[in-house]
Amino acid sequence: MLPMNRNTLGLAVTIATVFVSSTVTAEVDFHGYVRAGIGISGENGQQVRYQSNKVGRLGNEDDLYSEILLGKELYSQDGKSFYVDSMMALLSDGSNDFEGTNTSCELLKNSAGDVDDVSCDNDAEFAIRQFNVQAKGLIPSNPDAVSWAGKRYYQRHDIHISDFYYWDTSGSGAGVENLSVGTGKLSLAVLRQDSGDINVNNFDIRYAEIALWQDANLELGFNYGLINETDAQKAEVGEDPLMLTAEITMANVIGGLNKTIFQYATESYGEQMAGLGAGNSPDATSDDGIDGYRIINWGVIAPTKTWEIGHQIVYANSSFDSQDDHSIFNVVVRPMYKWDENMRTVFEGGWFTEEDNKVDSSGSKFTVAQAWSAGSSFWARPELRVYASYLKDYENDNAFGIGNDTEYNLGVQVEAWW
């Protein structure tokens, strides 16, 4: 349990009051996510993380991360409903028994052995990730449309095997989603995503479920970052960024699914293309004249009853007026062999090459894990895994400490969602 300061305690009391109100008899919805474990590396003490978005996350994570979601329908009458949703998140390095938000500090010494600085860190970070109300049935012509306001994860698109979010505009805001328009579904939202102390609002428009051919559909998206600077900030801000997204989803592809994504963006969103950003939290001071694009393909297939294979392929480029291009190409593959309903052997290999303003970098990772899960599906969780990973950096001889361009991780991890 986290030690509670006054603000944390007040928040907890508020949440509890909402969800246990005697005037509402519906059960509380309880969902969550957790990853945690223990591991060591060859040269760096505990297990290390190396470019996990580019080479894959299996056996390549060094944290304890959890999300706890509580939700409750507060009203349901005459086809109208109101639902309150909340989520708290906790992040730590998992190094101790009692990890809280109390700050721990250490004195730092210079080369002469004299104390000349202090470094302070929290054992754990606690965050409010979602707190919103979603209302359904308020639009008579669109009874399935959802009107919402508050802070929320907003229609996030990611690749699980690398934890790469390529379209994620989450934040505080408001909108209407799932409007039936033509043959598809329209969603409109505005979300606040400040850049430091500069106010930025992301206008998000999506049109989904556009039928293409059998078992295939298209989603289109437009994001516009409106920089709302003060008079004093006008000299330091750049141009408003925009991002266009097209995602084709195909079901029943060799027993699985496949997604192909095309994205084009300008200004600070353009910078995020090769930077593997998600189209949120733009840098309002970013240099003008940036264009970026990326092409992504990812999916999971089941070629036989005993094998499932996940993959991602990403190519991205960002062009600047003031410097040379930033480009990246990466591939991650995760094959899984199922021994029975609960035991599997999982492999993951990843490789990337990158050039950023004429600076080259590249690396790879290979992991083998023996795992036990609640079911045989690629997506079955909870999953307990024992893993060994080999990491290699091809450009930096000191990537893992002085004179070390390779490293290994050995560890045990659990991953669960519910």
UniProtKB/Swiss-Prot annotation:
Keyword Glycoprotein (UniProt): no
GO molecular function: maltodextrin transmembrane transporter activity; maltose transporting porin activity
Annotated localization: Cell outer membrane
Signal peptide (UniProt feature, chain positions): 1-26
Induction of the gene: By maltose.
Major subcellular site: membrane
Gene3D superfamilies for this protein: Porin, LamB type (2.40.170.10)
Record-linked Pfam families: LamB
Residues annotated as site: Important in sugar transport: Y165
UniProt-listed InterPro entries: G_neg_Bact_CarbUptk_Porin (IPR050286), Maltoporin (IPR023738), Porin_LamB (IPR003192), Porin_LamB_sf (IPR036998)
Membrane topology type: Multi-pass membrane protein
Marked site: Greasy slide, important in sugar transport: Y33, Y65, W379, W417
GO cellular component terms listed in the entry, alphabetical order: cell outer membrane; pore complex
Reactions accelerated catalytically: beta-maltose(in) = beta-maltose(out)
TM stretches of this protein: none
Domain of life from the UniProt record: Bacteria
Record GO biological process: monoatomic ion transport
Quaternary assembly: Homotrimer formed of three 18-stranded antiparallel beta-barrels, containing three independent channels.
Entries under NCBIfam families matching the protein: PRK09360.1 (NF006860)
Matching HAMAP family: LamB (MF_01301)
Similarity section: Belongs to the porin LamB (TC 1.B.3) family.
Function statement: Involved in the transport of maltose and maltodextrins.
Protein name: Maltoporin
Organism whose genome encodes this protein: Photobacterium profundum (strain SS9)
Record lineage: Bacteria, Pseudomonadati, Pseudomonadota, Gammaproteobacteria, Vibrionales
Gene of this entry: lamB
